[in-house]
Amino acid sequence: MRLLLDTHIWIWSDLEPWRLTSDVTRILSDTENELWLSPVSVWELIVHVEKKRVTLEKDVLTWIATSKQDLSLREAPMSWAVAEELRFVVLRHRDPADRFLVATARVQDLTLVTADRTLMEIDGVRILPNC
């Protein structure tokens, strides 16, 4: 499976793994699956750390580099096709990061791993729910 991690799933996988369901934990641990991360999630984490919403035991850039290596993360490209797909992403809330994740999952044919129920209601994207 080709899986795009929502930002909170990526963070929880290291900082709060108990928040992941056993199914999601098993699937993320399966080395046959590809784990993808959007640059938007990297930006979102940096913002959360700067605003003190997330606390890390090390520098944010070091944490990101370690996480990318530990999880064998692939970079999901922010392409023109993704930007163009954004116009079709309608969410109840206006979180631009979520819109980018949905558009990326659609364009790159990835399954979005999320606990966000709003994203679970979106048509045209495969979801692996963490609930």
List each model region and its residues.
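Short, well-structured N-terminal submotif of metal-dependent ribonuclease cores
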Residues: 1-37, 51-66, 108, 122, ...
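Short, conserved active-site loop motifs that form the nucleotide-linked donor/cofactor pocket
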Residues: 33, 73, 125
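Short loop/helix-cap segments at secondary-structure boundaries that form the rim of catalytic
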Residues: 118-125
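Active-site neighborhoods of divalent-metal-dependent phosphate/nucleic-acid chemistry enzymes
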Residues: 57, 61, 69-117
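Residue-level signal for well-ordered alpha-helical positions
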Residues: 16-17, 48, 89, 125
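Basic, glycine-rich
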Residues: 127-129
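Phosphate/NTP-binding elements of NTP-utilizing enzymes
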Residues: 45
